[in-house]
Amino acid sequence: MTNFKLKIASRRSKLAMVQTLWVKDQLERNIPNLDVSIEAMATQGDKILDVALAKIGDKGLFTKELEAQMLVGHADIAVHSLKDLPTNLPNGLKLGCITKREDPADALVVSKKNDYYKLETLPEGSIVGTSSLRRLAQLRNKYPHLVFKDIRGNVITRIEKLDAGEFDCIILAAAGLKRLGFESRIHQIIPSEISLHAVGQGALGIECKSDDKKVLEIINVLEDKPTSQRCLAERAFLRELEGGCQVPIGVNSNIDNGQLYLTGMVASLDGKKLIKDQVIGNINNPELVGIELAKRLKLQGADKILSEIFEEFRENKN
């Protein structure tokens, strides 16, 4: 039987390649006569490293180039960290599969020269590195005595900057650290009570052409239903708020006894305004749960906070 050829578009960063190679391996293990190849490339977000992510804009920073390859027929699927994939996709493309989630929490990584191992024990004036406005807003709200500094680059580059003495600690996604073998550098898994994680964090999203039934059937073997239900609720929450990857919006989701528990928050950039709420809903209608939570936060003033943030973004670009 002739092998079916499948080409994956991927970012070329170390973490992206680890994730894409995992997808390749799992597909070839589960689908007989499948020949998978990888096309690795740099995205806009990979190339612009001297500007804070929020100042660049967030519409497909890490995905556009991969999507272009699919739309012109040069790739069949694209593997993304789901947190980087916008909730509104280009015409002709869809989120075809969500894989089993790694730990979605944020993690604290401390400089080797320090012996402070938790956020709450960091002394006043400690320099904390993060490129995420979501983390920044929540941590400013909880720890106003700390100093926050932007940090760019891939996971390995950020750890090198930390060890070179530029920061006392940095905040990264626990999932990325674990996938790259840096679990021993995690000093604290940050509780959701302190920092809600990004929408989709810890899961991989596989994007493909909407009408490619053969490819959709192939990638379905990697679908993890509980992860998918949680992430679809999170993405619906973000979409309803009309937020993006670089806006201070955080979530936490769990499934218990057939019920979906979704917590969400919206914060101002300085962390002084923070609105948080939870919705419990039907696990079989995850998007409705996300939409309901977004509506609740809007009623509490989330719209006003987000409008102020977008206005500030526009002023900074001019």
From Swiss-Prot:
Its EC number is 2.5.1.61. Pfam families: Porphobil_deam (PF01379), Porphobil_deamC (PF03900). PROSITE patterns: PORPHOBILINOGEN_DEAM. The modification S-(dipyrrolylmethanemethyl)cysteine is found at residue 245. It catalyses: 4 porphobilinogen + H2O = hydroxymethylbilane + 4 NH4(+). One of its GO terms (cellular component) is cytoplasm. One of its GO terms (biological process) is chlorophyll biosynthetic process. Pathway: Porphyrin-containing compound metabolism; protoporphyrin-IX biosynthesis; coproporphyrinogen-III from 5-aminolevulinate: step 2/4; Porphyrin-containing compound metabolism; chlorophyll biosynthesis. Keywords: Chlorophyll biosynthesis, Porphyrin biosynthesis, Transferase. InterPro entries: HemC (IPR000860), Porphobilin_deaminase_cofac_BS (IPR022419), Porphobilin_deaminase_N (IPR022417), Porphobilinogen_deaminase_C (IPR022418), Porphobilinogen_deaminase_C_sf (IPR036803). Its cofactor is dipyrromethane. One of its GO terms (molecular function) is hydroxymethylbilane synthase activity. Binds 1 dipyrromethane group covalently. Monomer. PANTHER family: PORPHOBILINOGEN DEAMINASE. Belongs to the HMBS family. The porphobilinogen subunits are added to the dipyrromethane group. NCBIfam families: hemC. Tetrapolymerization of the monopyrrole PBG into the hydroxymethylbilane pre-uroporphyrinogen in several discrete steps. This is Porphobilinogen deaminase. It comes from Prochlorococcus marinus (strain MIT 9215). The lineage of its organism: Bacteria, Bacillati, Cyanobacteriota, Cyanophyceae, Synechococcales.
